[in-house]
């Protein structure tokens, strides 16, 4: 693997490391500017080690890298960003054009490494300033390959450095605000309102089913509801109805509310003391104060009973039949 490929891999790893180590753009990390300055000086020093460095056959256009602090202060933030992006983009085009004129050589390898550094700088600046199309700035034509390396150094020491040190903190804060912004209370309420109220819908469905149930009264409704219970489902038993007496409660003794659906052994306890009259929206009947049960309706709704009464239940008042003890 050539030295150029190794440098490109190192640049990619550095970019990924700077991106993952902090939530801010890579240009906001001061280590990036220091690294680019150090590498540009080192790369330029290696140019003297290449034999037969000749001028380019075709001059390349390079950006004007002269810097004036007074002129810099009079420019707007947008004009500064466009000026720097245009200069770095033009420098990258000049380096690629110069390398395209050369055969594989020491100078060509150095120009490849230089293009990698310029690409890294351009990507970092675009992450901070955006990818807006920069205007065409002032250019100068050069045939000396050394001018390519010097242009990068002057850009880093001048416009890029002042941008990152003076304008950079405010730009970095502005770029990181969208990723750390907390949604407002209004958006949270709107998001919560999108979810259906499943609890209220379930209660409404249950109330409507009970309200449409026709039968002699609350006792038949409860009996019909009990008749629909699957044996063994509530108490995790696997026997049939004939084999398991008292299958609803799963025990052979009166139970509390923890071992069955209904507590007690007599249907007299199934009176509705906890049911508030008028709790059901439609079809609710007034309770008979003497028996605790609603009167028999004169007409069944729709001509049928949704939960028919079970013929296997004992009559009210009769004690449960316990199996003989062997």
Swiss-Prot record:
A Pfam family per the record: EPO_TPO
InterPro entries xrefs: 4_helix_cytokine-like_core, EPO/TPO_CS, EPO_TPO, Thrombopoietin
Gene name of the encoded protein: Thpo
Disulfide feature: 28-172, 50-106
Positions glycosylated per UniProt: 197, 206, 235, 249, 256
UniProt keyword annotations, A-Z: Cytokine, Disulfide bond, Glycoprotein, Hormone, Secreted, Signal
Localization terms from the record: Secreted
GO molecular function: cytokine activity; hormone activity; signaling receptor binding
Organism, scientific name: Rattus norvegicus (Rat)
PANTHER family: THROMBOPOIETIN
Biased segments, Pro residues type: 308-326
Protein name: Thrombopoietin
GO terms classed as biological process: cell population proliferation; cell surface receptor signaling pathway via STAT; cellular response to lipopolysaccharide; megakaryocyte development; megakaryocyte differentiation; myeloid cell differentiation; positive regulation of cell population proliferation; positive regulation of ERK1 and ERK2 cascade
Domain notes: Two-domain structure with an erythropoietin-like N-terminal and a Ser/Pro/Thr-rich C-terminal.
Signal peptide stretch: 1-21
Gene Ontology terms: cellular component: extracellular region; extracellular space
Role according to the record: Lineage-specific cytokine affecting the proliferation and maturation of megakaryocytes from their committed progenitor cells. It acts at a late stage of megakaryocyte development. It may be the major physiological regulator of circulating platelets.
């Amino acid at each position: 693997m050539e030295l150029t490929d190794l440098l490109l891999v190192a640049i990619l790893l550095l970019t990924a490391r700077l991106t993952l180590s902090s939530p801010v753009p890579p240009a906001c990390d001061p280590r990036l500017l220091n690294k680019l300055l150090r590498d540009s000086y080192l790369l330029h020093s290696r140019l003297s080690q290449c034999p037969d460095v000749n001028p380019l056959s075709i001059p390349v256009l390079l950006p004007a890298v002269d810097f004036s602090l007074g002129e810099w202060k009079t420019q707007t933030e947008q004009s500064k960003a466009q000026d720097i992006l245009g200069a770095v983009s033009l420098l990258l085009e000049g380096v690629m054009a110069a390398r395209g004129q050369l055969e594989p050589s020491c100078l060509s390898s150095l120009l490849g490494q230089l293009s990698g550094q310029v690409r890294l700088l351009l990507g970092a600046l675009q992450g901070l300033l955006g990818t807006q199309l920069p205007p065409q700035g002032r250019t100068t034509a050069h045939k000396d390959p050394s001018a390519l390396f010097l242009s990068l150094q002057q850009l880093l020491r001048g416009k890029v450095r002042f941008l990152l040190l003076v304008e950079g903190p405010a730009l970095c804060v502005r770029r990181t605000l969208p990723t750390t912004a907390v949604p407002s209370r209004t958006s949270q309420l709107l998001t919560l309102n999108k979810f259906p109220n499943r609890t209220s819908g379930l209660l409404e469905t249950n109330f409507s089913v009970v309200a449409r149930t026709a039968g002699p009264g609350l006792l038949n409704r409860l009996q019909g509801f009990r008749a629909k219970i699957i044996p063994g489902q509530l108490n995790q038993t696997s026997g049939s109805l004939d084999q398991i007496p008292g299958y609803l409660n799963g025990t052979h003794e009166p139970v509390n509310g923890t071992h069955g659906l209904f507590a007690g052994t007599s249907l007299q306890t199934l009176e509705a003391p906890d049911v508030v009259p008028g709790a059901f929206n439609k079809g609710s009947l007034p309770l008979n104060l003497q028996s605790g049960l609603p009167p028999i309706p004169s007409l069944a709704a729709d001509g049928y009973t949704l939960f028919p009464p079970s013929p296997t239940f004992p009559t009210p008042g009769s004690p449960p039949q316990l199996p003989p003890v062997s």
